[in-house]
Structures are given as C-alpha cells and as structure tokens.
Amino acid sequence: MGSKGVYQYHWQSHNVKHSGVDDMVLLSKITENSIVENLKKRYMDDYIFTYIGSVLISVNPFKQMPYFGEKEIEMYQGAAQYENPPHIYALADNMYRNMIIDRENQCVIISGESGAGKTVAAKYIMSYISRVSGGGTKVQHVKDIILQSNPLLEAFGNAKTVRNNNSSRFGKYFEIQFSPGGEPDGGKISNFLLEKSRVVMRNPGERSFHIFYQLIEGASAEQKHSLGITSMDYYYYLSLSGSYKVDDIDDRREFQETLHAMNVIGIFAEEQTLVLQIVAGILHLGNISFKEVGNYAAVESEEFLAFPAYLLGINQDRLKEKLTSRQMDSKWGGKSESIHVTLNVEQACYTRDALAKALHARVFDFLVDSINKAMEKDHEEYNIGVLDIYGFEIFQKNGFEQFCINFVNEKLQQIFIELTLKAEQEEYVQEGIRWTPIEYFNNKIVCDLIENKVNPPGIMSILDDVCATMHAVGEGADQTLLQKLQMQIGSHEHFNSWNQGFIIHHYAGKVSYDMDGFCERNRDVLFMDLIELMQSSELPFIKSLFPENLQADKKGRPTTAGSKIKKQANDLVSTLMKCTPHYIRCIKPNETKKPRDWEESRVKHQVEYLGLKENIRVRRAGYAYRRIFQKFLQRYAILTKATWPSWQGEEKQGVLHLLQSVNMDSDQFQLGRSKVFIKAPESLFLLEEMRERKYDGYARVIQKSWRKFVARKKYVQMREEASDLLLNKKERRRNSINRNFIGDYIGMEEHPELQQFVGKREKIDFADTVTKYDRRFKGVKRDLLLTPKCLYLIGREKVKQGPDKGLVKEVLKRKIEIERILSVSLSTMQDDIFILHEQEYDSLLESVFKTEFLSLLAKRYEEKTQKQLPLKFSNTLELKLKKENWGPWSAGGSRQVQFHQGFGDLAVLKPSNKVLQVSIGPGLPKNSRPTRRNTTQNTGYSSGTQNANYPVRAAPPPPGYHQNGVIRNQYVPYPHAPGSQRSNQKSLYTSMARPPLPRQQSTSSDRVSQTPESLDFLKVPDQGAAGVRRQTTSRPPPAGGRPKPQPKPKPQVPQCKALYAYDAQDTDELSFNANDIIDIIKEDPSGWWTGRLRGKQGLFPNNYVTKI
C-alpha cells in the first residue's frame, strides 16, 4: 500500500531511464563478464545500486549522487523492493519494516575492500532509519547522537590510506535499539581493533588519524597558543609519511563538525578541551628524540620534554626517566625484587611510541563509552545492527594489523556464504520446490588456517604460543614464529612462506605479510612504568583513562591482541547469527578515486571473489523469479478481465489463471505453498511485455496530454508577463522573444563557491554571467545572482597575500537589497543593455536574458515594496558613477549611453570620452508578443512549415565571440576561501605554566619522509589457491560453444564533429561537448540543423560543428 492508503504499482514510479537490469538474477547469461558488463552500464549511467535478489550491490561512484534527498526517502518509505529502482533506502526500509512486523532483530552486513564505500553506505542507512522513524524529544536526541557519532568516530578512527581517503581504521557494529512502536530510543556501539600503530608509523603517502590534521587546521588562535599548535611538518609523527592534505577533505570545517558532535553527545566542554590537549600532547610526544650515550639512550634535546609534560599534566623529569629506563620485576629463590634497566635508543623510541599509541587508543575508547552512555537504555527490545568494518586490504608492506583486518573479512565472507545458501535452501524446502545445490568456494578452510586451536593449530594459536614462551625476549621472536609456521602448517595449500614472512591465499587474493613486529604487536602490553607515569598526572581526566590496578594486574598472562580480535570476531558472528541478515556488497571500480573511471580487471576480480556469480545461481536455483501469490496478482491483474480489478477466488488459482492466459509452458513455472516460481527470465519478460502493452498506450496518452497542457500554460504565462514589461516600449530580438525561461544559466548546483555569497535559505531565482561596464566602458565578466532579497554581482580576483597568494578566487563586488533599487533604464531598441539605478551609484550591465531577469526582478520588487518597478525607456541614458579618490577619474560624476539606428542584430559599442555610442539594427516592432507555439517537441520530420520545426532565432555565435566584438571570459570555478573559525574551548586544566615551544630540530636520517618505492600492490592481486578453487567449482556457461550472431550493420548517415561545447537554451535543442560526434538528420538554411546524439534528437547550431 502507498503512504496514502492507495496501492501503487511499481511501474508508476519508474519514470526513469533503464540501464542494464535492476536485478542480476534476470540476466539471460550468468558469467563474470555479463555481471561486470551490467554493473558497468549502470555505473556509467550513474546507477550505483543493483540487486541480486535481496542482496544489494553498491559501486562506489566517487562523487555525490543526487538521489539521496527527501523525495527519495518518501518514495522508498513503505514501498516494496520491486516498486522502485534499486536503492540502499529500499534495503533500509525493508529492515525497519521487518523488525516492526516480524518482531525480529535485523542486521546489515556491509562488505567490500578498502575504499569501496562501506562507511558511506552505513551513514545512509542510519540517516534513513533516523528520518522515517517517529518519536518525541527524547527519541530525537537519540537520533541526533546516532547521526553525530559518525563524524566524531571518523575523526579519531579514520585516516587517508593509499587506497582510500577516508578509510576506517577500526571496526564498528552499531546497534540501534527501538521501542515496540519502532522509535529509536537507545543504541550501542561495539568497536574492534583500532589501528593505533597509525599514530606512530604508516605507509608512505598516507596520513595519521584525521583529528591531528583537523586540530592544526581548525584550532582558534587561543587554542593554538595554549596547545602549542604550529605547522604540520613541525611534528615528527605527521612528517613520517609526507602527506598532509587530502583533496576532498576540508580539515578546518570537519574540526568544527567534530566539536559539534562532542556537544551533541554530551561531552562536557572541560572534557573536550582535555581530549584536544591529549591529541596535541601525542604530537609533541613524537618530537622527543634520542641519542646514544655509552650504549644507552638519552634525550637528544630536553626542551622537547616540556610541552608534552605540560599538556599531560606530568612531571618533566619523570617523563624523561620513564622514556629512557624501565623497572623490571625479578624473582629468585621465592624473593622478588625490582631492577632499574636503562634502555637503548631503539627501546626508548619504542617506549615513546607505545605511550603515544596508548593515549590515542584510550581517548578513542572514552569517546565510544561516552556515545554508549548517552544512548543507554534499561532493557533491550528490538534492534537493527549496522556492521561497518574495515575492508579487505593489501599494501606494499602488510603487517599484523592487515592480518587481523583480513581475518575479520574472511569471517564475514563465511557468514555471507553460509547464510545466503541456508536461507535459500530453507525457502525451497518450505515451499516444496526441488532444487540442485550450487557448488561454491567455501572459505572456511582459510578461517581454520588462521584461527584453529589444534590439529593443526592455526596461525593465531602458534603466534600466541611464541609470544608466551618468549615473553621477555624481543629480538628473534618473529623469526622463531616464522620457523614454527613453516614447520606446522607449511604444507597447507592456502599458506606459503618467504624469507621475511608468509603468504595467505585469502578469498580475495594472495597477501604477503611481513613478520617484522608481529609478536610485539600481538603482545600489545603497555609497560607498568608508563601506566604509573600517567596515573601520576595532576589531571583527573587523564588519570581516569588509566584505571589499572597495578598490583592485581601483575598476576596471570595478559590477553594478546590476536586472541582479542579472534574472540571479538566470533562474538560478532554469534550476534549476527541471531539477527535476520541483509547484505550490501560494495565494489570499488578503480584505484584513482575518480568518478566514471572503470577498471575492468579490478571489478571482475571483486565479482569473482565476492561470489556474485554463485550468488545469482543460488538465487535462481532453477527459478529466477519468485513472488507471493498476492503480490503477483496485484502486479499482473491487468492481463485478464477475470483478475482486474481483483480476483474473486483462491489466490493460487488466480495466479494459475494468469500464467495460462499468456500461454506460459507448464515446465516454466511451479506453484509452491505461498509463492509462484518462474524458471527463466524470458518467461518473466513475457509477462512484463504483456503488462506493458496494456499500460503503455494509456500511460503515454495521459502523460503526453498532461505535460503538454502544463508546459504550454507555464511558458505562455511567463513569456507574456515578461513581454508586458516591454510592450510598446522596446523593440524585441528575434532570437529571444519566443524562448523558454530557464532561470539558472550558470548551473549553481555545480558551483558552491558562488552559493557561499547567498544566504543559506535564499532561493536563487536567476543566475547568469553578464557583462558589466566600468567608467571607461570597459567590459568585465560578472556573475549576476537574483534572490527574493538581494541582487549579487560576483567577480574574480587574484589573492595578493596570505596562504592563497596567486590563486584566483570569487569576490563579492556588489550586493544590492531589492528595496534599494530606484529604477531600471533601457533603450527603445533591441539591444541587451540596461542600467540598474541605486541610491549610491548605478551599474551598467548587458545580458542576453535581460527580459527574463527584469520580469523576475519586477516580481520581487513588488513583493518587497508593494510598488511596481520603475522602468525607464530612452535612447539617451544617464549613468551615475561610484565616487573614487584616485587618478584623473576621481570623484563620482556621470556618464551617458546614447543609442543610434545601425545595421544587424549585433550591437556595436564605441566609447568616446564620457559617452558610450551604441548602434544596432532594427528589431521586431515594439508591439511584438511571443507566439503561442506548441511547447511539445517534434523530433521527427514534419510536413508543416519551417517554423513548426525550427526556432525563430538566429544560430548563436561560437564561444569566444562577443556580440559587441569583445572577447568573452570563460567561466572558471575556483575553490571558495575558507571561512573564519570559532572556538568555545576553555583554558588548560593544569597548574603548570605554559612552556615555550622549542624550534623544530633539523631532520635526522631516521626522520626523512618516505616515498613509495613501488605501487605494484595497487594492482589486482593474484587470486591464489582460492581463485583456483573458484575456477574448479564453476560450471561451464550454457551454449558455450555457439558463436554470437553478427550485429546488424549501422545505417550510414552524415555526421559532424562539435568544435565547441553547447548548452541547450530551449527544450527542443541538443546539448553537447567539444569533440562529440553528432548524426546529421536534416540540414536547414536557418543555421539550425536537426541531429541525434546519445539517443536524443534535437536542434543544434551548425556554426558550432564541422562535417566529417
């Protein structure tokens, strides 16, 4: 049922172009190539979503798509999946309704490799559920927390990698908890394996967590002073990888979003200040370097100790002591004693980095706990879980973190394989349908290789064993691990070793892991000395982040990072198994992160390892389409009189009647207990074709008539209102009197740098690039914007100083409030010049769309002043100048514009001293009105007159040519200047005096920024043993030996090549880009030819093209 209680068939909402198939179950040929080709067709037409049954495939567009607004939310709310094109909102709505109706917990598993768009998909699901669910003030508060948790956790947990500019470096399972009525009244976040090592080291070309760069870019002057914030390259930790800026990330703006998120979640201002204090403290901690003195470590420059000690509220000397030495407990003969051990340079650097990593991890845990406390509820009822976890990834050097990340992805792949197959199997059994199981690669063998406890032990068990037996030994542990792996699992088909590590044949391809640091990172133990140091802080907040009981914690073996992630992964699997699962399979189309860039081999590789072909086969399993009887009857009821408008009888018999009415063979369908199953896509297309024949004719007649009526009424009214302003007062131009009004001739949606000058909620009535003449009558380009309140003139200037020096940026040249306009002056001739008279000074402008502009200005003027806009018509116009205090043109003064009868439709301008002479030929008579021509477009040949097919206007001049002989400046967008930043942070909570910020040390050899030696790891990975397994379980495609029929030869038609880009000025025209090839259908002496481009037929100016 629709939202208003009236059933709407899904064809009613398909007012969109179709590209490929929406559901790949309906592909006539199931091969990896056909799947890739279908995804490519849809991707190139900006359809990023495709179904495989109930599974949603999402291809990352690397740009903002237009179909995520209020209109789409309303369209998908309460609608069945097949009623609208594939969309993530359909899946989110299905989850939400199933939870309410079935009273079952739901979850969505979002999987895909790094950079495939998983985090964005999770955001859309949470925002949709937040939007469609009801509730009062408390519920709205929970919704706000749910939405604001994303920017906060992204700031502290996301980073730029070589594969993804906003890569999640932690896993997150977000449970949105609901009341029985469906209102979100609570929530819970479980986070997994934050990649804290990113704080102190990362691959070349990557960044640390976003918050460090946000703080440096967005902090106020007061914050920068108190936190010791300076340039990014001052901090050793940030300079490691040589990457500071990201093209599509505005760190300054996102810093404000992070602060706002902390406010919404309820983190006190004092705690916010301390969180930022720790972030800055980590940066300053990294600047402490060490030198070797007698084989031991000493701080190279002690002045670098002062600021981190100050920010963390600890004693400077104690910090120095704990970084260069360690207390070790020793037992001998039943007695224990503490030994003071001095560290070497390598150990001191490790200790410093361990403290920095621990501080960031503890702050991250504090933020997660704060979010959970803000959403906590007494008891759980129903929930929807959203799993957004790090994607499968391969880097130049893959360490322990990548090993854990890829293990979790193996577990998720296993869930997908088992649950989709299990759910499909159960449906056939319940409906009494026979089916043949589909073979597939089960990656359980890889999961067991990693996590098995015994017989044989898995990699994680061997790793924990080595860490336990060599707990006090740092050197040689990694090589011992490698030797044990070779000895115990070296013969495993999904495992290989090499001199510095090992290789796992994952489901997504072979990954080579470097053993360096494996054991140390798995131990993940923070030295007691560092905990004692942080517990000595005079800041209670920092103390609270280290709550360990040091005496109690000395007993027992500490839990390793590997065992933690293994337990978290298995707990996650158990949680997901208790929910009704939904799936989003994200695909990354390229490594360039650019829209419309399609790497065929990369996509095909993902299609293969995600098992999409097997998924389609399982879904079809002999029957490509299935639908419950009621829905099937509703959809195809129009096919027979007996079923329309409703079937009177048993639903199953009604379905059988419909199938027999289209003469479908009995072996092409089967009726289950509650559903009809149709075998081949062609049989379904037969039903669709029959239905279309019934509806199509009626729909076209209604649509055509209605559009014709509305368009004619709208355009006639607009043209006549505009024409009345000039009627009997000014000659009209032949090429504009009958044109349609567009309003936006700049494309404001694509130019946010212009929107910054307009109020947030101001509607832009008119936008055009016009010519503005100065006191010397020299023409310059200005963007003219008209809103209900103001008129704006925007120009461009080079920045002369500051960080943006030399860049050309938009500048607001003039802003006139509508009510301050005194009058508008025009000539009586057909020119496009007019003068805006304002109290201070006038503006002399020229616009080919002057009539449209003046009609809109007149409306807004009347709304504001309750008076009509004064329009003055004369062939001698007075121009009042702006007062200046420089040069020979000082003072205000005036100028005069005189109009004379000339020749042709193009105005000729001749400035002379203080007078501008304008000559132009005669136009249409002053009493001319727009003709009431048909607004519907005729795209074929017509036997009528030329005027029926061609506009009454001259073909436009090619780009670069101005009608007055002046070269036009091309419109070039530039990034807007960054706005000012606010700060509401309080002062630091420490009794220490702020130390001076030490000068940056000269870069030593171990601090040189790295550059990637090779980008081979970005190539499609070797599929390994998993790929071989997939090939052996694949069945041959049907009719594999038959050659394809030869395509029909295309008809030969004359063609032309576009010399310049052209934007259609009317609804019957073609838009095209330079170098486009256009089929010529008809040439006309008027200069307007008829052509066809990309399936669309229309008029275009012949002076913009050349024949080929």
UniProtKB/Swiss-Prot annotation:
Residues 1051-1108 form the SH3 domain. Residues 730-922 form the TH1 domain. InterPro entries: Ie/If_SH3, Kinesin_motor_dom_sf, Myosin_head_motor_dom-like, Myosin_TH1, MYSc_Myo1, P-loop_NTPase, SH3-like_dom_sf, SH3_domain. Residues 19-692 form the Myosin motor domain. Changing residue 119 to I: In FSGS6; results in altered clathrin-coated vesicle dynamics when expressed in a heterolgous system; severely decreased localization to cell-cell junctions and clathrin-coated vesicles. Coiled coil: none annotated. Residues 695-724 form the IQ domain. Residues 919-966, 993-1053 are annotated as: Disordered. Transmembrane segments: none annotated. GO terms for molecular function: actin filament binding; ATP binding; ATP hydrolysis activity; calmodulin binding; microfilament motor activity; phosphatidylinositol binding. Expressed in the immune system. In the kidney, predominantly expressed in the glomerulus, including podocytes. It is found in: Cytoplasm; Cytoplasm, Cytoskeleton; Cytoplasmic vesicle; Cytoplasmic vesicle, Clathrin-coated vesicle. Residues 581-591 are annotated as: Actin-binding. The modification Phosphoserine is found at residues 980, 1002. It is linked to Focal segmental glomerulosclerosis 6: A renal pathology defined by the presence of segmental sclerosis in glomeruli and resulting in proteinuria, reduced glomerular filtration rate and progressive decline in renal function. Renal insufficiency often progresses to end-stage renal disease, a highly morbid state requiring either dialysis therapy or kidney transplantation. FSGS6 is a childhood-onset disorder resulting in nephrotic syndrome, which includes massive proteinuria, hypoalbuminemia, hyperlipidemia, and edema. Belongs to the TRAFAC class myosin-kinesin ATPase superfamily. Myosin family. This is Unconventional myosin-Ie. The lineage of its organism: Eukaryota, Metazoa, Chordata, Craniata, Vertebrata.
